[in-house]
Design a protein with these regions (language model features):
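Extreme N-terminal starter segment of soluble prokaryotic enzymes
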Residues: 1-4
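Active-site beta-loop-alpha junctions enriched in small/polar residues
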Residues: 6-10, 33-37, 71-74, 125-127
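Residues that form or flank phosphate/diphosphate-binding pockets in enzymes
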Residues: 13
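Active-site acidic/histidine proton-transfer and metal-coordination neighborhood
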Residues: 16-17, 61, 76-139
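Acidic (Asp/Glu)-rich catalytic clusters
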Residues: 19-26, 46-70, 107-116
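Conserved beta-strand positions in the central sheet of alpha/beta enzyme cores
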Residues: 31, 68-70, 121
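Glycine-rich, proline-tolerant flexible connector loops at the mouths of alpha/beta enzymes
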Residues: 33-60, 124-132
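Short active-site-adjacent helix-start/loop capping segments
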Residues: 38-41, 67-68, 75-80
Length: 139
C-alpha cells in the first residue's frame, strides 16, 4: 500500500512547495486538484505545450507519483444542484453550469491521459449543497 496526500489541503501554496513538503513527511503519492481556480493546477493550461510532462517531472523529482486528479467542485455541477448555492463555483443557468462542469471534468480526464494517471475523482452532486458547506472552503 502507498500513502498519498491530497494537495488541495494546501491550495494556497504552490504545487511544488506542497510536493516537497509531503515528500519530506514520507508520503509517496500526490492527488492533484484540477477544478477551476484551485490555485495549483489548471487542467486546460497544463494540456498546452508539454506543461503536463513538466508537472509530472516536478512531482517525480520529489520522489512522488501522481495517484489521482480530483475535480471536486466543477464536476458537482454536472448533476447539480444548479441554484444560487453553486454560483460560487460557476454562475450561470442550469445548462451553462452543466456545460462548464462537463468540460472541466473532460479536461481533467484529458490531463490524466497525458500524465498517464488512471484515476480522476469527481463529485456526483448533492441536493441543497449550500446547506452543508461552502466550497471551496471559507478563509
Amino acid at each position: 500500500m502507498k500513502l498519498g496526500f491530497c494537495a488541495q489541503n494546501y491550495s494556497e501554496k504552490p504545487l511544488e512547495e506542497v510536493a516537497k513538503m509531503v515528500a519530506d513527511k514520507g508520503y509517496e503519492a500526490l492527488e492533484i486538484a484540477t477544478y477551476d481556480g484551485n490555485g495549483q493546477c489548471d487542467a486546460a493550461e497544463m494540456l498546452k505545450n508539454g506543461k503536463a510532462k513538466e508537472m509530472r517531472k516536478m512531482v517525480e523529482s520529489h520522489g512522488l507519483f501522481i495517484s489521482a486528479l480530483s475535480n471536486h467542485a466543477d464536476s458537482l455541477l454536472i448533476m447539480g444542484p444548479y441554484g444560487d448555492d453553486t454560483d460560487g463555483i460557476y454562475k450561470g443557468t442550469k445548462e451553462e453550469k452543466i456545460k462548464f462542469g462537463t468540460e472541466s471534468l473532460l479536461n481533467s480526464a484529458r490531463l490524466a491521459n497525458e500524465l498517464e494517471v488512471s484515476v480522476v475523482i469527481g463529485f456526483t452532486g448533492i441536493e441543497n449543497f449550500g446547506r452543508f458547506f461552502q466550497f471551496p472552503y471559507a478563509k
